[in-house]
Regions:
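Collagen/collagen-like triple-helix recognition
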Residues: 21-71, 179, 692
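Surface-exposed, flexible coil segments in extracellular/virion-facing regions
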Residues: 113-154, 218-241
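Solvent-exposed loop segments of extracellular immunoglobulin-like
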Residues: 106-113, 210-216
Length: 827
């Protein structure tokens, strides 16, 4: 017990800061002391039931989860261009001044960049400044591609030639904000080249070129009362002036002594009134009714369907038809002049271009803006010039076609320039540009179609070598008449008729748009003058059917000189096949030693000729975004559209050329053998030779061959036809002296030659015997080679194959069989 007590006594208690000592045994318990301080909080009790939801709190701030942008800060500069739309002239300096403002930056810190977006390539000065300068191309440069096709008269200008230069000005501020503006500069509004012109539009003339190198023009405006017109460029080939009032203007070029009369007027528009104003006379009684067929062409509906939201078929949806299209789709739409054109009436009418192309737009124009609707569509005036009814102006539309200097040529032109004034515009209107590189555009054969060069025989050449002649001839063919071009009553064409058609130097045109396409009639596809089939062709082929559009090509691309084969009477002359023999080749027709018809598989091509030569673009045209081909040439791309790409066309052509060479050699050898046999038999050989460079003969008449040959030739080679007659080149054993007969264009000269070119009819014999055909006649000049001899027939066949130009591609099996059969006949 003691130890326990000691242990208890050993306990020290600290109270505050005092130390108590040890105490004795505890006394009895005292009364309870006062309550002590509260102890620390206990652990939390269990959760109570959830309380009611409180009111919604404020929205949380939005969080941008997109990537961080590096776009410029601020607004783009506002940009304008002084002279943004202007007509500057050809070879003229142009200045475009840009002005920019920027709400965020000092304008001195803006940067400028001019970009040419369309038009002829121009040399730009100041392209990195606010002010751009350049010079438009000259008129001569613009017309270079077609210069050889032009002649004295009015000068047409297409939209492409007018030089539609477009520019974009980009202005950038220091923060990278970009502002833009555009400008458009033309050298001149497009013109048709007609002598009937609108008031207020600058017109250009063209003087003779070639040997003429100086010009002296003058303008007489006395028949245009009140005119203050000024002629510019009077000493150049291309003078111009703006006809400023209604009336007649006469231009004279003193060096060539040629004159030109131009009639100026304002536009009239007759879309809604032609039935009453025009068809009173144009009713097929007083004058031809061209209006009824014209009303069914795409020209007549060039606006109405498009405003209503479809293409010309009235079905296919059209999504774009901007106001700028009205320049070609209406009458006289040109801001360059005030002459009652579509734009002039539009300004006063209150009409505005619809913002949406939809049904009812055209009807709205007709109902509420009839004066404007009168000028809508492509009408008579688009292609024939203004018809405002001014004294002396309306009358230019009416003239006799028999007039040798018809006034109608002020309003009628077959020039492609009339069509190109709309249809030659950048990438979507390119057909004239294609045509300009074609053989149809060349004028080297056009002179053969004029009365001045051919007299009445222009009826032969003019039917296919001139636009006017073919337009008349195609009507004959459509009626089943394949004879020479003649008057409507069937009598032979005379000077008055040929000049009235336009087959004279001042008006004749090459094979232009209007030669093949009838602007007044859509009866045939593509408004072609012929379609589908023909009763006859001048090569003797009859009943052509299912040729499609290609039948138009066949009208001229045939041998033309009647049928020559073993199924008709023997030939009585040496006429060769006319040069374009493509139709004969396609049908396998007109060859001696062969069945009468040997048709090509290519006749199954849709539209025959046109299926390959028009419908499919070449590789070059396709690369330019063009969908057809009015150059009419072909390439491997076109062939590959049907044939395997592995087909080696060049190897094929080389093989065919070799066969032609073999045939030519065989013909020459056979002819030489005949001439040698004649000499051996004691005959004398006489030749009338020809000089192609100057178109001269060694004697004045074909019946008087003049060169007596001392010996037979050492070689004979078939050459190209001389004036349509089968011809040879003779190599002589000894040179001879040739005196060329003078002509109107070449003097008489003498030269020594060892080779002579001559028509086969110009090789004659005189002596003891004659060839088997014709019968022997002692002493009389006779053809050394008969018209129905194997040499004459073989020569025809070779020319038929060669003149086709395709080297057998049009009809390979026919080509090869003709060669084989002709070689067999020559043995």
């Amino acid at each position: 017990m003691k130890n326990n007590r000691v242990s208890r006594l050993a306990i020290c208690v600290v109270l505050g800061s005092s130390l108590t000592g040890c105490t004795g045994d505890a006394g009895p318990a005292g009364p309870a002391g006062p309550a002590g301080d509260a102890g620390p909080a206990g652990p939390p009790g269990p959760s109570g039931p959830p309380g009611e939801a409180g009111p919604p709190g404020p929205p949380a701030p939005a969080i941008d989860a997109s990537p961080v942008s590096d776009a410029p800060i601020g607004k783009s500069p506002a940009v304008t261009i002084a002279g943004a739309t202007q007509t500057a002239g050809f070879g003229a300096p142009v200045t475009l001044v840009g002005t920019a403002s920027d709400p965020d930056s000092d304008v001195s810190k803006l940067t400028y960049k001019w970009i040419q977006t369309a038009g002829p390539t121009a040399t730009l000065t100041g392209a990195a400044t606010a002010s751009l300068t350049f010079t438009t191309q000259t008129l001569a440069a613009a017309k270079t591609p077609v210069m050889a096709q032009l002649h004295f008269g009015m000068l047409p200008i297409s939209p492409d030639e007018a030089g539609n230069y477009t520019f974009e000005l980009d202005v950038t501020d220091p923060e990278g904000n970009l502002g833009k503006a555009t400008a458009s500069v033309r050298s001149n509004p497009p013109t048709t080249g007609l002598q009937d012109v609108p008031v207020g539009i600058r017109q250009f003339m063209m003087g003779d070129g070639g040997a003429q190198t100086t010009w002296n023009w003058s303008l007489d405006a006395t028949a245009a009362p009140g005119s203050a017109a000024i002629l510019t460029g009077a000493s150049t080939q291309f003078p111009s002036f703006i006809p400023d009032v209604v009336g007649s203007y006469t231009l004279t070029e003193a060096v060539s002594t040629k004159t030109l009369t131009m009639v100026a007027g304002n536009w009239r528009g007759e879309m809604m009134t032609y039935q009453t104003e025009c068809q009173t006379c144009h009713n097929d009684k007083i004058a031809p009714d061209v209006f009824t067929p014209w009303s069914k062409t795409n020209h007549a509906i060039a606006v109405q369907h498009k405003l209503n939201g479809t293409y010309s078929d009235g079905v296919t949806p059209l999504t774009s038809f901007p106001r700028s299209c009205m320049e070609c789709h209406t009458v006289g739409d040109s801001p360059a002049a005030v002459n009652h054109g579509f734009d002039d009436v539009e300004k006063t009418s209150g009409w505005t271009m619809p913002t949406k192309l939809q049904p009812g737009n055209w009807e709205n124009m007709v109902t509420n803006y009839p004066a404007l609707a009168d000028l809508a569509g492509i009408q008579c005036e688009n292609c024939h010039g203004p018809q405002d009814g001014a004294i002396g102006h309306l009358s230019t539309a009416h003239t006799s076609s028999g007039n040798t200097t018809p006034a109608k040529w002020t309003r009628v032109s077959f020039s492609e320039g009339v069509c190109a004034s709309c249809h030659q515009d950048a990438t979507h209107h390119y057909k004239p540009s294609q045509w300009q590189t074609s053989a149809h555009a060349q004028r080297d054969l056009v002179s053969n179609a004029t009365f001045e060069s051919r007299g009445t025989t222009a009826a032969h050449c003019g039917r296919c070598h001139s636009a006017q002649g073919f337009a008349a001839y195609s009507a004959q063919l459509a009626a089943g008449d394949a004879t020479l071009l003649h008057k409507p009553d069937g009598t032979p064409a005379d000077e008055a008729y040929l000049r009235g058609l336009g087959l004279q130097t001042s008006t004749v045109e090459a094979i232009t748009c209007a030669a093949c396409h009838d602007p007044h009639d859509a009866s045939n596809p593509s408004q072609l003058r012929l379609g589908g089939g023909l009763k006859a062709l001048p090569n003797g082929l009859t009943n052509i059917v299912d040729a499609g559009k290609g039948v138009l090509c066949m009208a001229c691309h045939n041998t033309r000189n009647a049928e020559h084969d073993d199924f008709v009477a023997a030939a009585t002359d040496f006429s060769g096949p006319h040069t374009p023999s493509q139709t004969d080749m396609l049908y396998g027709f007109n060859a001696y030693f062969m069945p009468r018809l040997n048709p090509s598989k290519h006749l199954s091509v849709t539209d025959t000729c046109a299926g390959c030569h028009v419908a499919i673009p070449t590789a070059t045209e396709k690369a330019a975004g063009q969908s057809d081909n009015h150059n009419f040439q072909t390439d491997d791309t076109i062939c590959a559209s049907c044939h395997s790409a592995s087909t080696d066309g060049e190897a094929f052509l080389a093989a065919m050329n070799a066969q032609l060479g073999d045939l030519g050699t065989a013909i020459g050898s056979k002819a030489l053998a005949i001439l040698n046999a004649l000499y051996t038999a004691g005959n004398t050989l006489t030749v009338r030779t020809y000089r192609q460079a100057t178109d001269q003969y060694s004697s004045a008449a074909a019946t008087t061959p003049d060169l007596l040959l001392a010996a037979a030739p050492t070689a004979v080679v078939l050459r190209s036809a001389i004036h349509g007659t089968t011809s040879f080149t003779l190599t002589l054993a000894a040179p001879v002296s040739v005196a060329w007969t003078a002509t109107a264009s070449a003097p008489a000269v003498t030269e020594t030659l060892s080779q002579l070119d001559c028509q086969i009819s110009g090789i004659t014999i005189t002596g003891q015997t004659a060839p088997p055909v014709p019968p022997a006649t002692t002493g009389a000049p006779l053809p050394a080679i008969a018209t129905n001899s194997v040499v004459a027939k073989a020569s025809w066949n070779l020319q038929l194959l060669s003149n086709d130009g395709s080297r057998g591609l049009h009809n390979p099996s026919f080509f090869q069989n003709v060669v084989v059969k002709t070689l067999e006949a020559l043995q």
